[in-house]
């Protein structure tokens, strides 16, 4: 189990953004950054400006973006903006920096949305930012997100994750971080799990994959061992069937389950992700699960078990997180990790943007939307 010497919660969107940019601007040796996608907007361009400037002053810059994620985000961009981003990536490369796109090894994985979904940023200063945020306006001026700034030996685990995703890690960079971590008093317990299904599924990729995802299994274990309460945030709550069964088991034995996810209005480009989630509302509500929908978007990935164990990272409660995307989650019982998450759930519960889903939710919908749910709910795995 890795330990941290410091953990700073980054729920406030401006605070996380300022910390990310400050890390790049203050870097003296290297910066590593991974993201699901980077948007052609004020935030994406500002980060590319900072990375390019760092590389030009001699900092070793390594940027990892998911191919599928960038393609998905690119659907919302104009052809001109997509081309402009490619030029910016080439500029960083021309200065000696690394810009990589994670691509799964098998055709079926690539075809069906396999990729990496892990967001890590670290530098030689000995700090890493880890959590749910992409480098986009949505993450910093739209949705709720949760990241943490970490110091200590746990950073080496994050560096190992980047290497597992295909990032070339300079051995000198690893030694530099190890030296800093060893010099700091690390007493904050961290349980860290990482899994990439693309290195375990067969030639059909996620189709009919019977394998076990260690992060999914961990979430199931936490639900099965919960005694009083489990509070969850997810972009859209549409867990794989094994995880859904664990949620229902816990609720039926009296565990208070509260789910906070996004309202259909939070993703104006499509309602299909929400429809996939809505397909499970009936059985969740009948089991006693409380569901809240955030109108401006809930993109954090938090779990609070029995008010004493906080879990955070990149894992959405969805099929893709189980069988298509590499994901990572951290957990801790240390009050420094738990108290900020307690406060977040208290804030969410009382926030006017969070609308509770009532038992009569379906009949209150417009007829056209009800018909779309009936038509498309069967395709949940694909959405």
Language-model regions: role of each:
Residues 1-383:
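Charged, low-complexity intrinsically disordered terminal segments
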């Amino acid at each position: 189990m890795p330990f941290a010497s410091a953990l700073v919660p980054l729920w406030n969107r401006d605070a996380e953004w300022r910390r990310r940019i400050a890390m790049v601007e203050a870097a003296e040796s290297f910066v590593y950054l991974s993201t699901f996608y980077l948007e052609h907007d004020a935030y994406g361009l500002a980060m590319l400006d900072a990375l390019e400037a760092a590389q030009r002053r001699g900092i070793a810059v390594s940027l990892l973006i998911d191919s599928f994620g960038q393609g998905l985000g690119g659907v919302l961009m104009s052809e001109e903006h997509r081309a402009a981003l490619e030029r910016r990536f080439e500029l960083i490369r021309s200065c000696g920096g690394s810009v990589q796109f994670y691509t799964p090894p098998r055709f079926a994985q690539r075809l069906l949305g396999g990729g990496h979904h892990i967001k890590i940023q670290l530098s030689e200063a000995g700090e890493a930012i880890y959590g749910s945020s992409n480098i986009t306006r949505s993450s910093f001026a739209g949705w709720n997100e949760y990241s943490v700034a970490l110091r200590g030996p746990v950073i080496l685990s994050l560096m190992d994750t980047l290497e597992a995703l295909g990032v070339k890690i300079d051995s000198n960079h690893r030694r530099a971080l190890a030296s800093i971590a060893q010099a700091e008093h690390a007493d904050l317990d961290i349980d860290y799990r990482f899994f990439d299904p693309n290195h375990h599924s067969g030639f059909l990729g996620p189709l009919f994959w019977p394998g076990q995802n260690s992060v999914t299994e961990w979430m199931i274990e936490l639900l099965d061992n919960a005694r009083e309460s489990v509070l969850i945030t997810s972009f859209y709550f549409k867990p794989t069937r094994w995880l859904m069964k664990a949620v229902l088991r816990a609720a039926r034995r009296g565990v208070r389950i509260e789910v906070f996810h996004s309202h259909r209005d939070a993703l104006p480009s499509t309602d299909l992700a929400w429809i996939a989630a809505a397909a499970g509302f009936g059985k969740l509500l009948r089991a006693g699960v409380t569901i809240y929908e955030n109108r401006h978007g809930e993109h954090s990935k938090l779990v609070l078990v029995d008010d004493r164990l906080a879990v955070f990272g990149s894992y959405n409660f969805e099929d893709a997180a189980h069988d298509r995307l590499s994901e990572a989650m951290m957990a801790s019982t240390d009050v420094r990790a738990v108290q900020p998450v307690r406060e977040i759930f208290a804030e969410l519960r009382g926030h006017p943007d969070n609308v509770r889903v009532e038992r009569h939710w379906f009949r209150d919908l417009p007829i056209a939307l009800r018909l779309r749910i009936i038509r498309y709910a069967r395709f949940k795995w694909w959405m």
